[in-house]
Every structure is written in structure tokens, then in C-alpha cells.
Amino acid sequence: MIKSIDHIVLTAQDLEQTISFYCDVLGMQLEAFSPPDGSPERQALKFGNQKINLHDAQAPYIPHAKTPIPGSLDLCFLSEVSVEKWITVFAKHKIPIENGPVQKTGATGPLMSV
């Protein structure tokens, strides 16, 4: 049911140093994007059809990981089945949904997320 990774979220202690490493050393492209929920503009590191969204450990973006410490991350899978199907699967396995369904800005455009 999972076909690929869309993006991961990296919590960084020093955004400038993190951006420098990923862009200057690894050749990724810095990209700014505005989340569909109207929250402030954010930064991401784009490579191929994926991206790494950056969260500043000093000013965590909501929603964020339960314990957003520097070096922690979360990830977003792309699926060939609907969000509604995933809600059913999670309910069957008694897995609570922390956020969603909600529209997010994925690596290649808008997507629905839970």
C-alpha cells in the first residue's frame, strides 16, 4: 500500500548550519513554502521528488513530534490507497490519529495527511 516517501521532517538546532550542510555539501536546493493552513512560511530542502522539511528546535512548528529535539525527525509516506482507507486500517489496529485528515504541502504538491 505504501509506494514511496514524500518527505521527512528534521528538527535542527542550528538552521543556518543545517541548510549549509545539506545545500553546500550535499547539493540540495533550499525552498520556501507556505502551508495550506495559513501558518507562517517554512523552509525545506528539495532533492529529486522528495524534500526534508526543517523545524527549528528553538521555535517548534505545530504540529510537531512528541519530543522535538535536535536530530529527531518524522516522515510522510505516499500511498496508493485513500486517506479514508488508512483511517479504517488505523482504527482496526487501535492506532490513534494525532492530526488529520488535514491538507499538507508535500514534496510535489498538496496532499492529504493523517
For the regions a protein language model found, what residue spans apply to each?
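A generic structural signal for short beta-strands and their flanking turns/coil linkers
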Residues: 6, 26, 41, 48-50, ...
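Vicinal oxygen chelate
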Residues: 87-114
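Short, conserved charged micro-motifs
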Residues: 17, 82-87
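N-terminal beta-strand motif that seeds the catalytic metal site of vicinal oxygen chelate
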Residues: 1-16, 73-75
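Core segments of cupin and vicinal oxygen chelate
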Residues: 11-58
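Short secondary-structure boundary/capping segments
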Residues: 43-44, 64-67, 105
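Short beta-strand micro-motifs in enzyme catalytic cores
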Residues: 41-43, 73, 109-114
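Helix-adjacent hinge/juxtasegments
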Residues: 55, 62-79
